[in-house]
């Protein structure tokens, strides 16, 4: 097996995450196909009917993460849900990646990016903190979930980032019990 190939166990974990987080078309996953929508149309803010602006209740986190030009090229196509199971809509404008919950249109993440040599850098992540729109409260979990969405979108091996996300959530649950 090549280093970047996923094991059957990794594929099952991916399915569990995709099912719980609603990224992609789970029926395609069962058929052994890529659950992420095909990149045949470039998503824009006008592609999805009910998107809303980032609320005033939000936090901004500085990032310093380099991603390839190829990855940005894929991300610029956006993510247009094909089925109800897919809970995310995403589009990019000139310098921002924007993720929305597809059912409600609530903006959850906005990430600024800049050109950096031959690649790009993710520089600033804005995270929704309106409790009426989004229940996230842990910055580390939110950064990890955002990175999972990005890695999955470009077809990368997202198993390790998923494990990190689950670990953060488990630690949060344990702290609540104390």
Feature-to-residue mapping (PLM):
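A structural signal for the main folded, soluble domain(s) of proteins
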Residues: 70, 79, 92-94, 117-123, ...
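Canonical SH2 domain fold
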Residues: 90, 97-115, 124-125
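Negatively charged, low-complexity tracts enriched in Asp/Glu with abundant Ser/Thr
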Residues: 11-96
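Contiguous mid-protein beta-loop-alpha structural module that forms a pocket-lining wall or clamp
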Residues: 2-3
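Intrinsically disordered, low-complexity segments enriched in small/polar residues
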Residues: 75, 89, 97-101, 118, ...
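Polybasic, proline/glycine-rich intrinsically disordered low-complexity segments
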Residues: 119-178
């Amino acid at each position: 097996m090549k280093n970047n190939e996923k094991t059957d166990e990794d594929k099952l974990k991916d399915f569990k995450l995709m099912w719980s987080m609603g990224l992609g078309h789970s029926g395609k996953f069962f058929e052994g196909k890529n659950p992420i929508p095909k990149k045949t149309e470039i998503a824009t803010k006008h592609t999805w009917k009910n998107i809303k602006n980032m609320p005033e209740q939000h936090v901004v986190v500085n990032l310093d993460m380099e991603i390839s030009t190829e990855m940005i090229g894929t991300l610029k196509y956006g993510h247009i849900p094909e089925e109800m199971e897919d809970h995310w809509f995403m589009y990019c404008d000139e310098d921002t990646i924007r993720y929305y919950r597809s059912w409600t249109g609530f903006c959850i993440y906005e990430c600024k990016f800049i050109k950096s040599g031959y690649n790009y850098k993710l520089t600033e992540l804005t995270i929704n903190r309106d409790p009426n729109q989004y229940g996230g409260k842990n910055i580390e979990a939110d950064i990890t979930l955002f990175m999972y969405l990005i890695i999955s979108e470009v077809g990368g091996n997202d198993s390790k980032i998923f494990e990190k996300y689950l670990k953060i959530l488990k630690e949060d649950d344990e702290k609540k019990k104390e």
